[in-house]
Amino acid sequence: LVIELGANDALRGLPLTSTRANLDAMIQLGQSINAKVLLLGMQVPPNYGARYTADFANVFVEASRKYGTALVPFFLTGVADGPEAERLFQRDRIHPNELAQPIMLDNAWPSLMRLMSP
């Protein structure tokens, strides 16, 4: 089971307790049916403030530790933080476009393959 909870919770102004609860519920549901879980971490832009930005990223790290899931710390590495970020996003500057997909695949694939190995 691959879980990627994007930054929409932050964009909607939800408290981190809600984000954490949403993530916990998804992981617990997957684990309740014995699914192996890969958690794809997300970050929010720095304009949310240093503390919130760090706390948001930490939600994924903490959930991975708590439930023993595999984790890709930041699914958009090389997309959102790279020199070509502007051309890798749709006009909304929030959602990656088709050019970003191979980079995102490269970010997730090694962890996914480890989970799928016998």
Q: Which residues does each PLM region occupy?
A:
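Alpha-helical cap/lid subdomain in secreted, periplasmic
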Residues: 1-118
